[in-house]
Design a protein with these regions (language model features):
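Conserved catalytic cores of very large enzyme subunits
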Residues: 1-244
């Protein structure tokens, strides 16, 4: 049956619907080679998922039955879930970790609004090592994640009242037995995902700070913050150096 799906996908030559291919050490080699051949067409089909990684992941995510974990399927983009028994919500929100870096550099203050949005993790004058700066960044990130979770909890509670998923709840195990809809923990399992944005930009920025401030000592952190606060006005040479 797997081989037939791969043949059909090869014949259709479309990027949707997305096909997931579960891989394990006992997989039939001919079928695996057929999946690889389809991948060579450049359509991004199929997506490969390793059972040795995903089964333990499902168990760690709350599943307490190894048989159900072995029966996992892919929902959303790459999330392994127990089909028919999970309330999976693919997008709980976004966290911009580059913005978190900006909050770190301004001691928790959002420079755009002037509001004290994050915790006070220390002024730049106090950050005399990259380790101290990273500790402050991690503290800001931890606070923002907690803030995000609280906001998501409020939104989820409101959704259960304003837009209850009654019909969908009849299709997922646990809801009828408990007399609860999905949004009120009716399903046997529940999980969601949060998108992290700005990862590459934040990594590049941290690398630039480490190199220019702490390794080469070309600028101090207070000087860098001052330059950033003025959007590099009169300091284009620093702009180019930090970019490169």
């Amino acid at each position: 049956l797997t081989y037939l799906f791969l043949e059909a996908a090869d014949g259709a030559q479309t990027t949707q619907p997305a096909i997931s291919f579960r891989y394990n050490k006992k997989i039939d080699r001919e079928t695996f080679r057929r999946a690889l051949k389809l991948t060579q067409k450049g359509l991004g089909q199929p997506a490969f998922f390793n059972d040795d990684i995903n089964i333990p992941r499902v168990l760690a995510n709350g599943c307490n039955d190894i048989r159900e974990a072995r029966d996992y399927a892919i929902e959303g983009c790459v999330e392994a879930q127990v089909p028919g028994k999970t309330d999976f919500r693919p997008v709980a929100g976004f966290i911009n970790i580059l913005k978190v870096l900006e909050l770190t550099m301004f001691n928790g203050v959002d420079p755009k609004t002037g509001r004290q949005f994050g915790p006070k993790t220390g002024t730049m004058e106090e950050m005399d090592t990259m380790e101290k700066f990273m500790d402050a960044y991690k503290a800001q990130l931890s606070y923002i994640i907690d803030y995000h979770l609280k906001a998501y909890g409020i939104c989820s509670a409101l959704h259960s009242q304003i837009c209850p998923t009654v019909f969908a709840s009849t299709l997922v195990d646990g809801c009828i037995e408990k007399g609860r809809i999905l949004q009120k923990d009716g399903a046997k399992y529940s999980s969601t995902g949060t998108f992290i944005s700005g990862v590459a930009n934040a990594a590049d920025s941290l690398a630039a700070i480490d190199q220019v401030v702490f390794r080469q000592k070309l600028l101090t952190l207070p000087e860098l913050v001052e330059i950033l606060a003025n959007n590099y006005e009169g300091h284009e040479e620093w702009h180019q150096m930090l970019l490169n």
